[in-house]
Design a protein with these regions (language model features):
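Conserved, well-structured core domains of diverse proteins
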Residues: 1-119, 131-144, 149, 161-192, ...
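Hydrophobic faces of well-ordered beta-strands that scaffold small-molecule active sites
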Residues: 119-124, 148-154, 192-198, 218-224, ...
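Conserved, mostly hydrophobic/aromatic
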Residues: 123, 143, 330, 393, ...
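Active-site beta-loop-alpha junctions enriched in small/polar residues
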Residues: 126-128, 155-157, 197-203, 225-227, ...
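Phosphate/diphosphate-binding loops
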Residues: 189-213, 359, 363, 433-436
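Active-site beta->alpha loop and helix N-cap motifs at the rims of alpha/beta catalytic domains
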Residues: 193-203, 224-228, 271, 278-285
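Glycine-rich phosphate/ribose-binding loops and adjacent secondary-structure elements
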Residues: 266-451
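Gly/Ser/Thr/Ala-enriched C-terminal appendages of enzymes
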Residues: 370-371, 385-521, 525-530
Length: 530
């Protein structure tokens, strides 16, 4: 069985000429001399390194489509005909109390100082990619109104054209970071938070010091990695001057914009863009614990950690060291991941897939707990988009997982809402939207709820993408309530691993979740044999 065929994908705007394709190579079974394309090898003939990345940069997000032997679709959710766990104090389970709107989907995370969220979901890291920058108002206001945490990703200060550094090379003024934080905080309603992520370059630039000193942020996130790639973050730059500026700030920029040969190729328009890369991080226990102490010394109340689809060794380090450092939330992001810009073939072929990585995380967390060590609050990430995914991740990771990180899925409603506004302004709503109406009040089912939160007069300042994210978050919450009610679990802490069953023996082996014909079999036989 072939799990992923290379050499042609919509992400790289490429396609095979032939309908007959060699599964492993992705080459047409009959490659014709004279073919006009348009597979990846054809395009790489004259565009070379540009074919490494999905595109066009700044207009898309991309998600790898490798079909793994086991994934979350191999789990199904149990339903019961009696019971009601996790009801509010004093309530007895009966048909009048056990209704799905009564399900409490609020959650919280943190070692000592907790953060409450309206739903067990938060955004992926929205950093220096163009898709994050230009849609920030939609994403941030939407997350704030929805009562969930927003992660401001890496390199935001480092790529700011208006960045000012002091005499020590540290951030003195970062207007784009200021804008991002202010936008979220303006509509923050006491649930969720904004936290800023740091990588190697951010640490060197003193980003933590800046956001603590100027904005008084309570949480900072250390980034070890992500599911989409095992190298540092990337963006594309389309001017020589900008490439040289970022190189001067300490970033790795390729091809080298200071090379006269590269400059000549850029001026002749053979080279049309440059890539800005972040450095690989290096971790060790002593350094990690010391950095956590340093950040707390700056005034941060919470420190979170994001790790990617690395080998199980690194997963164990994140859990063990995170426990020692009293990390407030550990986000574990499995392959294949989604991105604003990552190497496409790396996305497809590297890393431990989500369900394998998450299953190992639970195994290791159980061992830590059995040793008497406290497990940090966990969040799972990697390929989630719907309410059933939330339930499955929370159940698989019970009792450690408190929330699920949604990357691309949380961005899409922001972009769609923005585009609805653009279409209305241009008088060209597509039928997929106009079937519901021609004004925001008609189109957005949650318009009045958002207006109730911020006030009618303030709605003129609310971007439609934010209303879109609020609507999507509502769909997730209500859908999760229904699934939880069917499983007779009326609060997030009440969800257990028993609420899942494996549809295949291989899934049962990977996850430790019983095969469908074994789940609850003992209880069933006790009834039959009674």
């Amino acid at each position: 069985m072939n799990f992923q065929r290379p050499n042609a994908n919509d992400a790289t705007i490429s396609v095979n000429r032939s309908r007959s394709v060699v599964p492993q190579s992705g080459l047409c079974s009959r490659c014709v001399d004279g073919c006009v394309g348009n597979c990846e090898v054809f395009q790489a003939t004259f565009r070379g390194r540009e074919l490494i990345y999905p595109g066009p940069f700044g207009s898309i997000t991309a998600g790898a489509d490798k079909d793994y032997p086991v994934d979350y679709s191999h789990l199904n959710i149990q339903g019961y005909a009696l019971g009601g766990e996790g009801l509010a104090d004093g309530l007895e389970a009966n048909p009048d109390t056990c209704i799905f709107p009564a399900v409490n989907v609020q959650t919280e995370y943190g070692w000592d100082v907790k953060v409450k969220m309206a739903a067990p979901v938060f955004t992926g890291a929205l950093g220096s990619t163009e898709i994050a920058r230009k849609n920030w108002d939609h994403f941030s206001v939407g997350a704030a109104l929805s009562g969930v945490t927003l992660v401001c990703g890496e390199n935001v200060c480092g790529i700011d054209p208006d960045l000012e550094l002091d005499c020590n090379g540290k951030v003195k003024s970062a207007p784009d970071m200021d804008r991002r934080i202010a936008t979220y905080e303006r509509y923050h309603r006491g649930l969720g938070e904004i936290l800023v992520q740091m990588n190697v370059e951010d640490t060197r630039l003193g980003v933590a010091e800046y956001v603590s000193r100027k904005h008084g942020l309570e949480t900072i996130e250390l980034k070890w990695g992500q599911g989409a790639k095992c190298i540092g973050g990337e963006i594309k730059v389309r001017s020589l001057e900008r490439a040289l500026e970022l190189q001067k700030r300490g970033y790795v920029v390729t091809p080298d914009p200071s090379d006269p040969i590269i400059q000549a190729a850029f001026k002749s328009r053979a080279i049309k863009e440059f890539e800005r890369h972040s450095r690989l991080g290096f971790i060790d226990e002593e350094g990690f614990l010391a950095e956590c102490d340093r950040l707390r010394g700056l005034g941060f109340k919470r420190i979170t950690l994001k790790t990617g689809a690395y080998a199980l060794r690194e997963l164990a380090m994140a859990l063990k060291w995170g426990s020692k450092a009293k990390i407030d939330l550990l986000t574990i992001d499995g392959a294949p991941g989604g991105t604003g810009m990552s190497p496409w073939r790396m996305m497809e072929e590297w890393g431990v897939p989500s369900i394998y990585l998450h299953s190992a995380a639970v195994e290791f967390a159980d061992k830590l707990a059995a040793q008497g060590e406290r497990v940090p609050d966990l969040a799972f990430a990697g390929g989630f988009s719907s309410e059933d995914h939330l339930f499955k991740a929370l159940a698989l990771g019970s009792p450690y997982v408190k929330a699920v990180c949604l990357g691309r899925a949380m961005m899409i409603p922001g972009m769609v809402g923005k585009n609805v506004a653009n279409w209305m302004n241009n008088g060209g709503l597509p039928k997929t939207v106009s079937q519901y109406g021609n004004t925001p009040e008609e189109i957005f089912v949650c318009w009045e709820q958002v207006a109730d939160l911020v006030g009618k007069d303030e709605m003129k300042n609310i971007p439609l993408g934010a209303v879109g994210i609020f609507s999507f978050a509502q769909k997730l919450s209500i859908g999760l309530q229904q699934l939880m009610a069917g499983a007779r679990r009326f609060s997030i802490p009440a969800i257990t691993r028993r609420e899942l069953m494996s549809l295949t023996k291989e899934c049962a082996e990977v996850t430790g979740i019983p095969y469908v014909m074994d789940a609850y079999r003992d209880e069933a036989l006790d009834i039959i044999e009674s």
